[in-house]
Amino acid sequence: MKTTLKLTAIAAMSAFILTGCATQDKSAEADAQLQQQAVLGLNWIQQSGEYQALSYQAYNAAKVAFDHAKVKKGKKKAVVVDLDETMLDNSPYAGWQVQNNKPFDGKDWTRWVDARQSGVVPGAVEFNNYVNTHGGKMFYVSNRKDSNEKAGTIDDMKRLGFNGVEDSAFYLKKDKSPKAARFEEIEKQGYEIVVYVGDNLDDFGDEIYGKQNAERRDFVAQNKAKFGKTFIVLPNPNYGGFEGGLAKDYFKGDSSSKVKARLGAIKAWDGK
């Protein structure tokens, strides 16, 4: 009887271990699948002339918009920009994720920022320095963390040739991701924001923060006259608010659920 009980216990434990291993294997497989889906977009950012052309095009439009913008009497001219994939190129970090099948992790991201190896988005330095030397002021409103990612960010930007990157120009994330409150802080200092530059619709306000893609597309349609004038968009196929807009609670799910949501959102020909 004791032998039977021992064998039963061993069998149960073995089944538990095997189930756990299978779950871990499926999780690792989903992590890998999620990262491999980013490969072509990453190739496009790092290798294509089209990505560079679109970036220059965006900053050329931003310069024209800045030059033509008028501010109210007594106000100072300001431009608000996002940082990641707007001014700074983090595609090597994305490459590390792909090669190691690593989903986004805040600690890994901070290590990347600390490494001070960001690249520059084409046209960003020239636009930044033009604004700061032609009667405007650049403000960097980013969800990099204010507490432990500001120093590495400033060092990187100085290394890359950005001027005007003193501490007071940075409005990084302290507690909340939405940016409208930080825009208001800038305006309270006597500035009028005439141009917003970003790779994510959330860089232009909070109206559609966390919303689904249908609502995000509606926002674009309602504000189409502002794009290329007040709102300047940089290309970024790899991540952003659009990803969370694929499904409700998308970012609360694991890699498997994200893969499912991505595939489920595709519109496809039936072959007939």
Residue ranges and their predicted role:
Residues 25-32, 150-272:
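C-terminal cap/substrate-recognition subdomain and adjoining C-terminal extension
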Residues 85, 124-157, 199:
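Substrate-recognition element of Asp-dependent hydrolases with the DxDx(T/V) motif
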Residues 67, 71, 92-93, 129-137, ...:
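Sec-exported extracytoplasmic/periplasmic mature domains
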Residues 72-78, 87-119:
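Active-site neighborhood of HAD-like aspartate-dependent phosphohydrolases
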Residues 44-55, 110-118, 139-145, 171-173:
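Second-shell loop/turn segments in exported
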